[in-house]
Amino acid sequence: RVWNTNPTHPIAQGIPESFELKEEEMYGEFFDIPKPDDVVFLSWYRGGEVFRSGCTWQRGYGKIFYFQPGHETNPSYHNPYVLKVIENAVRWAAPVMWRENLECPNIVESPESKYLKK
């Protein structure tokens, strides 16, 4: 079961309080990650194991979202709520505006330059 622990977060929009995944690979805490800015989803597994399964961070201009469900051998990507979370996360992480070139001296052409050229 995946619990929506932060229903006001943009990634959680349109996601119910909880939803079931028939099969999913189980992970457990201690999950050695930096302290998240937000925990959007928690997963619960039979036996009582709980896992921070949806976390966000912001680093500089970048936004990062980790989402645990979706092992390639399980049908998680067919779940409409998993697909909605991924869609919401892409929209959340997308830049609101293109930023000025960051002037990295060791990079000949910055990755964002192709979007800034007219």
Ranges and model annotations:
Residues 1-61:
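Catalytic beta-strand/loop cores that center a nucleophilic Ser/Cys/Thr
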Residues 48-52, 58-118:
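Extracellular ligand-binding/catalytic regions of CAZymes and related secreted enzymes
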